[in-house]
Structures are given as structure tokens and as C-alpha cells.
Amino acid sequence: VMDEAHTVEDTASEHLGIRLSPLGFEHWLRRLLTPDTGKGLLGYLRAGPAAQTVARLWDAVADLFREVPRAAGLAARDGQKTVTGPLALESEVPDLLRELSGRLGALIEELEDQDEESRSELRHLRGIGVALGGMLDAFLAQSLPDHVYWIEREGKRRQPVLHSAPIEVAPILREALFGQVKSVILTSATLAVGGRLEYCRDRLGAGEECELL
């Protein structure tokens, strides 16, 4: 059952795309280690090799979000810029994310039968890093088919945020939702257009079986 179903298309577009921000990276890195203070899980565990990689990532991420707007042609005064092709820039971030994933994996194995709480947190943080790396690779290479890519300055600090979204969500929802679930109920006062559901049905990929009740 989906309430406020008139928002499904926009919500799906947001969740099926990419959003990478400096603050998102910083929040994740801070949970691992803040180099200046030594705070974070890796500081608590005294995990030297992984901590060194995180320290390098702090600098590399800062460089990345300075370079991406330049490579995309987003001027300081611009609020948004569509990215129409893969970006020609060099960044250490993708390689460092892969390096960190390996080091966190090794650390998880080292802690076996010792500290399950820390191991669980490490697995969670490692998964976030893998997801961030996958989204960054996809954005820089524009490897997601039928997506639009853009950079947008957000917040009081006007930090550049990397976005992508599928051009149409209907094929994705048709395969992942309506084609898999026997019954889907969409409730909203504004689904029908002129008393008919064709427009909503086509936009969401609900198929001809969609009925108005």
C-alpha cells in the first residue's frame, strides 16, 4: 500500500539515482576517523593501516569536490549545471575507497571472536564506502543507462552535490515492483486525470491491469 501515491514518481527518481555530497562523505569518514583528534572507530581500534587510508581520503575528497565543478564547467555563481559526458579529471578517491574496503575487510577478519560490536559497525561502514565508490564511479563515467547527470550547489555553503536520476522510472518500477508484487494499492486524491488513470499508469509503469476504485 502506497499512500500519497502522486509522489511515487519523484520519490522513485530520487532513490534510484545518485546523490553525492561533501557532507555525506565527511559524515561517513568522521565515523571512521577524524585525523586531527583521533576520534572514530579506527582510532578506538588503533587500526593503523586503515586509519592512514582514511586520512588520505579526507584530503582526496576535499580535492574531488573542488575539481568536479571545474571539470564540469560549473562557475562559482552558477547554481546548477547539467553534465553531458564523462568528466576528465584525476582523483585518488576511487582507488582509496577500494583500498580502504580491503583494509576494513582484513580488520574485520582480525577481530573475529573478539569484538562483535566493532565488527558489525565495520561491516556497516565498509558497505557505505562500497556504495559511495560505486556511485562515484557511475557518476564520473556516466555509466548508468538512461540517466541524466548534473551538479547542484546546495546549502548555505553552496557546496557542489553530484546528482543523477533515471529519465523514466516506469520501466524500473514495472520490473521491480508491479511485475513482482501481486497486488499494489496506490492511494491519492490526485492520481486520476479527467477521471482516468492512463497518465499515472504510464508514468509509473503500472500496466493495463491498473484499476480505479
Each model region followed by its residue ranges:
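ASCE RecA-like P-loop NTPase motor cores
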Residues: 1-213
